Each structure stands twice: as C-alpha cells, then as structure tokens.
C-alpha cells in the first residue's frame, strides 16, 4: 500500500508541475497585457468550486481551501518572477 501512496504522490507532484507551467504561461500573458497578477474573482471562484468538489469527494471544504491557498501562493510567486523579469 505504501507503494500506491508513493505513486499517487508522484502523480500529484507531476500534476502540480503541469499546473505551474500553465500558471507561468498565464503570467507571461498578464505581463504582455499589463494585467495584475492576482485576479480576486477568479481566486474566489476556484476556492468555492474546489470546496464543493471536496465535499462531494468526502473531504472537508476547509482542507481543499488550505491546499488551494498554497497552490495559489506558489502560482503568484512564479507569476511575479515573470512580471519582474526585464
């Protein structure tokens, strides 16, 4: 069973890496179009949708919110790096 957990953890990391690649592409788009990095409405929409999804999957919405808050922080960090490049 530990092997299964390890494989799932690897898959999670690969998916997060893919998500961050897309976030960097979005960061480039935002830089080119003089947009702010944080889009509050979109962030709130994600938290709401993932909270509802967590409930359907037998997890607490608070758990999902914590995960996605950390994902969002890293996304913002990476997009800020792009924005600050000259």
Which stretches of residues belong to each language-model region?
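Domain-level signature for soluble enzymes in the chorismate/prephenate branch of the shikimate pathway
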Residues: 1-86
